[in-house]
Amino acid sequence: MSMFNKVTKTFQWGDKTVVMETGEIARQATGAVLVNIDDTVVLATVVASKSAKPGQDFFPLTVDYIEKTYAAGKIPGSFFKREAKPSELETLTSRLIDRPIRPLFPEGFYNEVHVVIHTVSLNPEVDADIAAMIAVSAALSVSGIPFNGPIGAARVGYINGEYVLNPGQTARKNSQMDLVVAGTEAAVLMVESEAQQLSEDIMLGAVVFGHEQGRIAINAIHELVRDAGKPVWDWQPAAKDEPFIAKVTQLAEEKLRAAYQIRSKQARTQALREASASVLESLKAEGADFDAVKVEALLFDIEAKIVRSQILAGEPRIDGRDTRTVRPIEIRNSVLPRTHGSALFTRGETQALVVSTLGTERDAQRIDALAGEFEDRFMFHYNMPPFATGEVGRMGSTKRREIGHGRLAKRALVAVLPTKEEFPYTIRVVSEITESNGSSSMASVCGGCLSMMDAGVPMKAHVAGIAMGLIKEDNRFAVLTDILGDEDHLGDMDFKVAGTTAGITALQMDIKIQGITKEIMQVALAQAKEARLHILGKMQEAMGEAKTEVSSFAPKLYTMKINPEKIRDVIGKGGAVIRALTEETGTQINIDEDGTITIASTDSAKADEAKRRIEQITAEVEIGKIYEGPVVKILDFGALINLLPGKDGLLHISQIAHERVEKVTDYLTEGQVVKVKVLETDEKGRVKLSMRALLDRPMGDSGRPAPAERGERGDRGDRGDRPERGERRERREPAGADQQQQQQQSTGAGEHSGQMDA
């Protein structure tokens, strides 16, 4: 009899088989489920504290997604040969899992919950993120922890006009969309996507399709819970102290309503702080027994009620706008004088200083991902320091939120970037948020597009982004355009849409409540399009098209094509030739396997010099052409002349002069620069040269050209074997001269050979 009480559920999901197991691995966790989708295997565990910490006023949920390199049969490349800090992909996947499960824990549940997911086996054609979301949903469901799930999740592609469920890496290369949707059986909770300028209807159809497919996983999880679920915790939220709530409401409501009539964020924030302090002072004066943390939570609830009721009643929003108006926009380009491209994008009290930098192929980010190595030549980094919200805080490592916002902005812009052939630069965009009052990630999208255009990046179209919000009470709802920070906190949805005039390039949605219908999403998308087109109009006024030239401070890229067989000559033995080229010309040189060479330099003269030298190195010796080069070696039977870098030819003693030459050194010295004509080349690449062919024949006493000298007569042989009269017979070469010539010529070429990757 086995020591394990193992329960397994198998179901077919599209063209993939999914196996869920629990009861064998990680039995001491509150809940643990192993999910296998066509050899991609993830282990999700969840552990929850039995009680909340005293004074806890928020839900402490932590999600850690971890990829193990052994899952792909690899050993980590770091010095310590073990997994270290989370990669960007691991951080983004952790956020992807966190977002749909967080709203499903009941209000008032403040027990610490830690979700850990390990990817332990990877099929590159099956993404681990979807398997991880299914596994986490199942682990939470079987754990007995208070959780209003399960959730389902699915990836949706759009190929040849049809939606595709969970496309793999290969299929996604032909997909116009990469969308991940998660939700409960009844409602969508989270959407994350990028697209190739698709319409609102196509995007909404993908969300609906993905949600329907996610229900298949939800049904299987219900079956697993029936067979292996643990008893549900006997947890009840703390009873509400209605008299105390009424007291706080009486003290605070009027002051809070007055504060929310103030249109300026800073003044409003100050008024809210004063209202909070006043309530606490009044409670102290009355001798009430209270917890300050609970009072702050009550004040937040009162604020939410005030703001939400005003909006649903058709009253102006916090800053005085109606539900459809975008805040005032101001744009300034070329803000920073020495950067390659920059833009300052301000929308109300949200401001982004966005800077673009152009680099060479060497500057591209090389990522050793679990599914395989790849190169990324477009990077978008988002930073938001504490001063952006007028707060004191710590500056340190990049936060998860910053990584997530940067990736969203990147998703929005990547669809309109030029191809590598059209624009071979590596591009890095950095968005510095200098003010924030809602939708800073979408300000980063707008500023990023403008700064790249300012840098001379030939974008296919302008891209703008907008953040939408939602207030919903029963059957009444209001969709808000361009939400403020307070509206984000107090509302029910954060819905970000980016795109061009032609369609959507990125969509992100986080919903805090159940009951968001397809109709509400349609209204939100239509309203977002209206706002997006308005912002695009402002951007086009500020910068109609990209600059035609890159900045004088940016490297200029010059491309040339050589015979791939000549690559080793350009690199040289141990990289000696290319190293000398880059050092002596002050350029960066990149060589592709197909023979494409890219030269990068801020000085066109230096780039031209590098190009000239590469042309010399790779040039072929032409028969009949005259070259000028130094004597590199004197031989008994002639001399080696350098014609091109790495290419020497043999000047035979008989081809030095018209007269008889007894000693080569009487005519030539090493280092002497001479002009020679190429007589012939053979199949082995040996080159025969002549100086004599470029010299006039000396005149005899009669004024006629002197007859050519004859060699030793020896055996005269038959008449037919003799040369015609006046024709010169070449001197016989010493034995082995041909082999010496081959050896000497190959020596020079050999010095420039080397491995391409040296």
Curated annotation (Swiss-Prot):
What residue spans carry the Low complexity bias annotation? 736-745
What SUPFAM superfamilies does the entry give?
Answer: Eukaryotic type KH-domain (KH-domain type I), Nucleic acid-binding proteins, Polynucleotide phosphorylase/guanosine pentaphosphate synthase (PNPase/GPSI), domain 3, Ribonuclease PH domain 2-like, Ribosomal protein S5 domain 2-like
Reaction catalysed?
RNA(n+1) + phosphate = RNA(n) + a ribonucleoside 5'-diphosphate
List its EC numbers: 2.7.7.8
**What are the subcellular locations of this protein?**
Cytoplasm
Q: What InterPro entries has UniProt attached to this entry? A: ExoRNase_PH_dom1, ExoRNase_PH_dom2, ExoRNase_PH_dom2_sf, KH_dom, KH_dom_type_1, KH_dom_type_1_sf, NA-bd_OB-fold, PNPase
PROSITE patterns given for it? KH_TYPE_1, S1
Single Gene Ontology BP term?
A: RNA processing
Sorted alphabetically, the keyword list is: Cytoplasm, Magnesium, Metal-binding, Nucleotidyltransferase, RNA-binding, Transferase
Q: Which Pfam families match?
A: KH_1 (PF00013), PNPase (PF03726), RNase_PH (PF01138), RNase_PH_C (PF03725), S1 (PF00575)
Q: Which residues are Mg(2+)-binding?
A: 488, 494
Q: Where is this region: Disordered?
A: 692-758
Question: Could you identify this protein by its name?
Answer: Polyribonucleotide nucleotidyltransferase
Which organism is the protein's source? Paracidovorax citrulli (strain AAC00-1) (Acidovorax citrulli)
